[in-house]
């Protein structure tokens, strides 16, 4: 693979990744609610989730989802409903949080209760995005040179995309977490939970409205 093609791929991916989708909205909402403690599990989940989506795309599931409206809809609804479930949990936590909660209560939110749950929730949101899986099937071949080893090129492109996605998620997580720390009062944290739940709800609706590429 030539450097020109690789740089073109990096540029195209960077433009697309900067635009927030369901995964990044999830990262922002959790970072706002949980601060710096969420950064590592969130970024790791994005990297592993994108790796999973890339793997299943290359193994043929992406082609199946592109060809079958039924299976695309099944995966789409699974991901969208899961996002709405997470949104409901975060909104409920925000509504139940008293305005005069102690700082310790705010610093250690109970929903989700652990870094593992932050990781698992974000991973599922990323991996269960059928539009992303189909996107990889349509997008990666545009940067493949027929005369060169196909598998090697796919590995390079996949590793590049996952790296860029992790960097992008890190940037969003750091900025969102910083906003949460700057406004660390109980009332502000309650608002962050409500805002985060709203973002997750928007991401869920976005996922449910996704259409199968023609």
Q: Whereabouts are the PLM-identified features?
A:
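Membrane helix-loop-helix hairpins that form the core translocation module of multi-pass transporters
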Residues: 37-118, 175
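Short, strongly hydrophobic alpha-helical membrane anchors
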Residues: 1-4, 214
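Selected transmembrane alpha-helices and immediately adjacent juxtamembrane segments
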Residues: 115, 122, 126-131
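Juxtamembrane transmembrane-helix termini in multi-pass membrane transport proteins
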Residues: 3-73, 138-162, 169, 173
């Amino acid at each position: 693979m030539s450097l020109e093609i690789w740089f073109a791929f990096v540029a195209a991916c960077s433009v697309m990744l900067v635009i927030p989708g369901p995964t990044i909205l999830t990262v922002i909402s959790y970072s706002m609610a949980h601060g710096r403690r969420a950064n590592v599990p969130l970024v790791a989940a994005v990297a592993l989730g994108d790796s999973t989506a890339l793997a299943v795309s290359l193994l043929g599931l992406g082609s199946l989802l592109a060809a079958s409206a039924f299976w695309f809809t099944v995966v789409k609804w699974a991901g969208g409903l899961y996002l709405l479930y997470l949104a409901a949990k975060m909104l409920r936590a925000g509504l139940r949080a008293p305005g005069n909660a102690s700082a310790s209560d705010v610093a250690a939110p109970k929903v989700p209760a652990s870094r593992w749950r932050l990781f698992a929730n974000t991973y599922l949101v990323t991996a269960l995005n059928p539009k992303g899986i189909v996107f990889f099937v349509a997008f990666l071949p545009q940067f493949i040179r027929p005369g060169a080893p196909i598998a090697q090129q796919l590995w390079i492109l996949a590793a590049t995309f996952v790296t860029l996605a992790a960097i992008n998620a890190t940037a969003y997580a750091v900025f969102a977490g910083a906003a949460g720390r700057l406004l660390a009062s109980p009332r502000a944290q309650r608002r962050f939970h409500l805002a985060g739940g709203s973002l997750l709800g928007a991401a869920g609706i976005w996922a449910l409205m996704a259409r199968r590429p023609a």
